[in-house]
Amino acid sequence: MTVKEYLGQARFLNLFLDVKLAQIKELKSQAEKSAIILNDDRGKADTLERFKQLEEKIQGEMNRLLDLKMEIIDTISRVDDDECRLILEKRFLNGQKYCEIAEDMYMSEKSVYRIQDKAFKKIVEIKNKMTVDGME
């Protein structure tokens, strides 16, 4: 996986997390409806247990996504160049377009690309160091 692909995951994590939260909300609503509709206690308990298992599975997926997002944020925060770090945060954490970043930072898009390439090299160094140090 390239650095751009790795960091690019952060842009979609919020969308995935929103989907998971909506799934849990819908699941809880269905569980409440099922509890009201089901008459026998055994059937109700089995159904509610299944809903609980499904909710736990979705929570596990959310935790995995949050862990990945925290890892990406931590990796970006380790970049020692403020300008590089700011561009990575704006692009991959805030989802800004290159032209927006260039305008915000009073530079050309070409400069944004150049600094981003420099930042990618720093990320590779950080990831390599993390692997060598056994942090990953």
Each predicted region: which residue ranges?
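Short amphipathic alpha helix immediately N-terminal
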Residues: 79-94
